[in-house]
Amino acid sequence: MSDLPDTDFTQRFLFDDRDVRGEMVALERSYAEVLAKHAYPRPVQHLLGELMAAAALLVGTLKFDGLLVLQAQSQGPVPLLAIEYTSEHDIRGLARFEAEQIKDDARLADLMPGGHLVLTIIPVNGQRYQGTVELDGQDLSECFTNYFVMSQQVHTSISLTADGVRARGLLVQQLPAEIHKDIEEREESWAHVKALANTVKAEELLGLDNETVLHRLYHEDAVRLFDIQPLRFRCSCSRERSSNALVSLGEQDAKALVEECGGTVEIDCQFCNERYLFDASDVAQLFAGGGTDVPSETQH
């Protein structure tokens, strides 16, 4: 990580007198990197920021080594949103959109009507997990809250917001019974935490530090705030991966593709717009066992 001030991080907190944990996320530089790759309309900027924040919060609830992929799809003006977040806290994202169909005040239902979001966990070791989030809430916060209640059967409340410069998120989640084992007490305790979490305003999340937000919400509770976990924008594309894609076609088809493309194949990364060019000599070298001219899988 750099020596610049921390603007991109997650931060856990815990209630000492309740079976509840929480997590907050702040995104600025990584959010700006994602938005800089394409000319996104403002409503799409907001959706991307909220989904980035959601990905960071979700990884905080999981214990795995690997990759979390969020893909929202619809038949509306925004047919695709995609976020990838690794257990090393690297994040990247993109959206596809029809700009002429997007109004400045468009909301989730306008942008992605009838949409759904697929959540995929790809561990380094172990089986892939996939879950589905219906985009039938008023906003992404409500959609993800419903997902946890319906699919994971865990009391969870999520608040997400983004303004094109900053993206923020707050998650509170009930833990297994340790402090309040009585069912009624346990439900009352959760209801208290959730009710206060639901009062947080977008301007508070965007404009205040985490400690201040938590004090405003839970000043009567014993809350411990842990150290931050920095995160960053990092794209996993590389010349080596692009080379492997060509090799997977087979030598005959790869050489035919070069000819069809006028002598040079261009492979573009949709996430970061990096371009990788391969001419006939490059392709011949790949199949001669010469490898690529970039020996390692450089990421940026």
Curated annotation (Swiss-Prot):
Give a Pfam family name. Answer: HSP33
Q: Which InterPro entries match?
A: Heat_shock_Hsp33, Heat_shock_Hsp33_C, Heat_shock_Hsp33_N, Hsp33_helix_hairpin_bin_dom_sf
Is Ribosomal protein set as a keyword in this record?
no
> One GO CC annotation, please?
cytoplasm
Q: Which GO terms describe its biological process?
A: protein refolding
Q: How is it modified after translation?
A: Under oxidizing conditions two disulfide bonds are formed involving the reactive cysteines. Under reducing conditions zinc is bound to the reactive cysteines and the protein is inactive.
What transmembrane ranges does the database entry give?
Answer: none
Q: Which cysteines are joined by disulfide bonds?
A: 235-237, 269-272
Location comes to: Cytoplasm
* Molecular functions (GO terms): protein folding chaperone; unfolded protein binding
Organism superkingdom: Bacteria
Extract the Gene3D superfamilies matched here: helix hairpin bin, Hsp33 domain, HSP33 redox switch-like
Protein role:
Redox regulated molecular chaperone. Protects both thermally unfolding and oxidatively damaged proteins from irreversible aggregation. Plays an important role in the bacterial defense system toward oxidative stress.
Q: Identify the PANTHER family for this entry.
A: 33 KDA CHAPERONIN
Family statement:
Belongs to the HSP33 family.
- Spell out the protein name for this chain: 33 kDa chaperonin
Q: Which organism is it from?
A: Pseudomonas entomophila (strain L48)
Gene name of the encoded protein: hslO
